[in-house]
Each structure stands twice: as C-alpha cells, then as structure tokens.
C-alpha cells in the first residue's frame, strides 16, 4: 500500500467513526461529565475545523470552507477551532443544527479527498506552516488528523459509554 493509500484508508475509518458519532439526541451529544471534559459535539466541531484548516489553509493555501455562513447555519462559534480553548468555553460549544453541521463536515472531507486523489509522495514532503514553525504535509496529516482524530474517537466512545450509548461503528463490528 502506498503512503497516500494508507492515509486515505486511515482517514476513511476516522471519518466513518466521526459521522457515526453524530447519532444521538442533542442532550447526549452535548453531555459533559462532572470533573470537566469535552462533549461529543465539541469533538466533532474541533476535528472538522482542524481538518479544514490543515488541508485548505495550510496545505492548499486557500480559504477554509468554514466561514461566517457555516457559523450561522450550525450555531457554532465563527472564530477558533478548539486548540487552547478553556474548558468553560469548550463546554459552551453547541451544534444547533446537526444536519447543517454534517453538510459542513462532508464538504471538508470531500476537499481532503480531492487533495489526496492528486497528491504524490513529494507533496507529503513539502513543508507547511505549523503552530511551532514548520512541518511536512505528511506530518501535519499523520499527527493532527490521523492520530489526533483517533484520540478524539476514543474520547467520544468514553462519553457514549458513560451514557449507555453504543460505541461508534458498533454496527459495523468495530469501534
């Protein structure tokens, strides 16, 4: 399997899990346990905003899909993406319209797929800006998308378990 193929397969798995994580009531998706944490809704918003920023702004050097219109449609903050966000602010993140949010998620994932469909191994070596300097495109995707998203998938499954909900992708025989 090529490196690009590996990335595509890993992101496909993460995206399916994140899509499945949208299933639940508003109360379940916005549940925050005592002692602080994020909600499932926060995890969904954060992972999608991160992917949008990495693929579109950093790698493709174009505007992100997110704009004020998506904020209005979903009820989410127009600014920010969750990194460094205090728990109190994170717990206020609320997705008012999950269908609109799902449309944003799908648009971001489609942009990522278009990039990966034409990317080469040389593209993965190109340096792009990061919060601490630069990193390769491959590092940005593997660290901040593949690894990070699967960490949030575990967080989502923990939050679902605390509410007696099935894990994401349980119907597919995995989690």
Regions found by a protein language model. Give the residues of each.
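Short, charged, low-complexity loops and linkers
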Residues: 1-7, 90-93
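Hydrophobic alpha-helical core bundles mediating ligand binding, dimerization, or RNAP-core interactions
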Residues: 7, 11-18, 22, 105-112
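Short, contiguous alpha-helical
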Residues: 8-12, 19, 27-84, 127-175
């Amino acid at each position: 399997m090529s490196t690009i193929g590996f990335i595509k397969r890993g992101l496909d798995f993460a995206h399916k899990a994140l899509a499945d994580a949208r299933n639940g009531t508003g109360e379940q998706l916005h549940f925050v346990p005592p002692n602080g944490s994020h909600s499932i809704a926060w995890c969904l918003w954060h992972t999608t905003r991160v992917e949008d920023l990495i693929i579109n702004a950093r790698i493709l050097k174009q505007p992100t899909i997110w704009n004020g219109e998506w904020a209005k449609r979903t009820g989410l903050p127009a600014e920010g993406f969750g990194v460094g966000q205090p728990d109190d602010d994170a717990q206020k993140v609320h997705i008012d319209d999950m269908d609109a949010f799902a449309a944003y998620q799908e648009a971001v994932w489609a942009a990522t797929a278009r990039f990966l469909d034409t990317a080469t191994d040389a593209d993965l070596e190109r340096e792009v800006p990061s919060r601490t300097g630069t990193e390769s495109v491959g590092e940005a995707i593997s660290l901040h998308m593949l690894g990070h998203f699967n960490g949030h998938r575990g967080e989502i499954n923990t939050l679902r378990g605390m509410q007696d909900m099935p894990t994401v992708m349980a119907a597919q025989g995995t989690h």
